[in-house]
Amino acid sequence: MRIAILGFGSEGQAMLAALKRDPVYRSATITVLDRNKKTSVPKNVRAVAGPAYLDNLRQFDLIFRTPGFPFMNAKLQAARRKGVKVSSVTRYFFEHAPCAIIGITGTKGKGTTTTLLYEILKRTGRSVYLAGNIGLPAVALLPRLRKNDLVILELSSFQLQDLDRSPQVAGVLEIFPDHQDAHRDMKEYVEAKSSIARNQKPDDRVFFADSGWSRWVAKFGKGKKIAVLPSRTRLIAPADMAVPGMHNFRNAVMASAIAASLDVPKETIRDAVRAFRGLEHRLEFVREVGRIRFYDDSASTNPDTAAAACRSFEDPAVLIAGGKDKNLDYATLAKALKDSVVEHVVLFGENREKIWKALSGGHVPAEFASSLEEAVASAYRAARLFSAQHAAVIFSPGAASFDMFKNYKDRGRRFKMIVRSL
């Protein structure tokens, strides 16, 4: 059998190790495919690396794609039509996991929700694992998993799109437009998300945010459907939160509701929420310079999350935004700015003019910067002119990072380095 692994980051490497362990595939010829021409692979493993890495997909019997590679890629679909079987690292994990899986999806907040839920469940003494973008690749956990364990898994639209199984417990956060550069339209994006509930069994549960697309996804569940309403929760209160923003409170309510359904005591939930300090690059406090507080929200890659960041503060603020465009509409951000404490905007990156046009006609002055260094300097200068006792500089790009950086983490680390040098 000729097998290809599509992508050779941490997930692809874990997939290779899993195939080497699996007696079904032990004798297969495995080839690694990766865009990066400097990709290094183990001995006895073939590699096709560089710009032409997708040119001969039809030669394989089976292709495992890693989470970051879209199922609807034209060359992958062409190979599929010619009879090549296409699976994924996530699908392999669902087929082989011996224990219950809790899956969380949504447009943003997945990492925060999964991590907080993990922190809550850890306090009960249960054997629980966190996997996905945060934690280990899920397939790397397979050798150690046992029947009574729990795995909490962050699931993106790319991972869910061709999944034919659903987690026993699903959490659906708010869904709004994203990845429109990789999905044909919003309908395809939301239909991909629906796989988190579509294959559930009658004893399974789906928790969902009470918003339009989230309700639509949840309706496919065959088990119990639970609407999660922050305004009605008695488990936690906004005052219990150490991280700013009502969007973070909504994430915490989702994690708390799922934990409560697993019989976690209310006080255990509340203690974990109070101790939770959030995740890196998600409205992360960096430092205070004079009376100016700097926040890193580099994980914000669409206008809705940037809008949420702007609504999270009470002190006057400067917003730094911009990056690689994903065919998204910035009207949401423009509307949020009108009702927020943001008094100045600094735009940089590939789509800075697109964002500026969306903001035109608003009452918030904006300026351009040619680099992140220049953007931070301009934002700091503007914030120092505010008369309030404290002010904030919010780095919430609302766009992808690939125009100037490796990824959002690289972008966030660069921002923090610049701020610490002030």
Where are these regions (language model features)?
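Active-site regions of enzymes building and remodeling cell-envelope glycoconjugates
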Residues: 42-52, 60, 83-84, 99-102, ...
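Nucleotide phosphate-binding/pyrophosphate-handling subdomain across enzymes
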Residues: 12-18, 127, 241-342
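Residue-level signal for inorganic ion chemistry
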Residues: 19, 63, 104, 133, ...
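Phosphate-binding loop of NTP-binding sites
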Residues: 20, 54-58, 67-224, 377, ...
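Short internal beta-strands
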Residues: 30-35, 206-210, 320-321, 341-350
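C-terminal helical cap/extension that packs against the catalytic core
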Residues: 41-44, 331-391
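N-terminal leader/targeting and accessory segments in enzymes
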Residues: 1-88, 92, 244, 367
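Residues in the short beta-alpha loop(s) of Rossmann-like NAD(P)-binding domains
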Residues: 9, 36, 134, 210-212, ...
